[in-house]
Regions:
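Perimembrane helix-loop-helix junctions
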Residues: 5, 192-222
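Membrane-proximal lumenal/periplasmic loop motifs of glycosylation machinery
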Residues: 35-40, 55-81, 85-96
Length: 227
């Protein structure tokens, strides 16, 4: 298995500086562009309304795990309510800032993948930050309930990197499985990608790894039957 190049050494400081500068630039542009036009939408109010209203009666597990438009969005629920607890609901700016930080993570994952497939580090550093703006500054770039799609995808890419591309250690299996479970917890739509990892292992006859890869899917199945 090819090893990821080290991109934090002295020889790559310029590339890293370019990457983080562009991420900061795009994030700032999005905040400036939408700071007066963003607001909470029906998905947010559903979380703040019915879930919080039933918290005392139905318990914390129902609060986190109850379906939202037929999906598990426990991570989104904790994200919304946690920020509201600290900042209130007068301004959407704290949500926009956290979305920019999360999209930095998405860009970083793509940055690493680009280097892995052989793209020049400087070219990757220039291209990857464009995942911050997602085409013509669409709502996925600043609205949390849509941003979770790309954030979950990034966790699934981390899952694939550790679980499929590096099966040489138990640590890699644990990291890959944990990333998948976290991605599904944030938004369950990414559960559809888990069978891809399992299929790769079955083709390679790596039965133990295929079993480990199935754990997030099994956990999702239990949630689906329970809630």
């Amino acid at each position: 298995v090819l090893k990821l190049p080290k991109i934090i050494g002295l020889g790559h400081r310029r590339e890293l500086a370019v990457f983080w500068f562009l991420c900061a630039l795009f994030g700032t542009l999005i905040l400036l562009r939408y700071r007066h036009h963003s607001a909470f939408f029906i998905d947010d109010w559903t979380i703040f309304g019915s879930r919080l209203g039933h918290l005392d009666r139905l318990g914390f597990d129902d609060f986190v795990l109850r379906r939202h438009n037929e999906h598990l969005m426990g991570g989104m629920v904790l994200w919304d309510v946690g920020l509201a607890k600290f900042f209130g609901l007068r301004n959407y700016l704290p949500w926009m800032i956290t979305v920019q930080l999360a999209n930095c993570f998405v860009s970083w994952v793509f940055f690493r993948y680009m280097i892995r497939v052989g793209l020049a580090t400087l070219v990757a550093a220039i291209i990857a930050p464009f995942f911050m703006i997602w085409a013509p500054l669409g709502s996925v770039a600043y609205w949390a309930p849509e941003a979770v799609f790309t954030i979950s995808l990034a966790f699934l890419m981390v899952h694939f990197r550790y679980l499929v591309l590096d099966t040489s250690s138990n640590k890699a299996l644990i990291l890959g499985t944990s990333a998948a479970m976290l991605g599904i917890f944030i938004h369950s739509i990414c559960a559809v990608l888990i069978p891809i990892s399992m299929t790769v292992f079955v083709i390679q006859r790596k039965w133990r790894s295929a079993f480990v890869a199935s754990v997030p899917l099994v956990m999702y199945g239990l949630w689906f039957l329970t809630y």
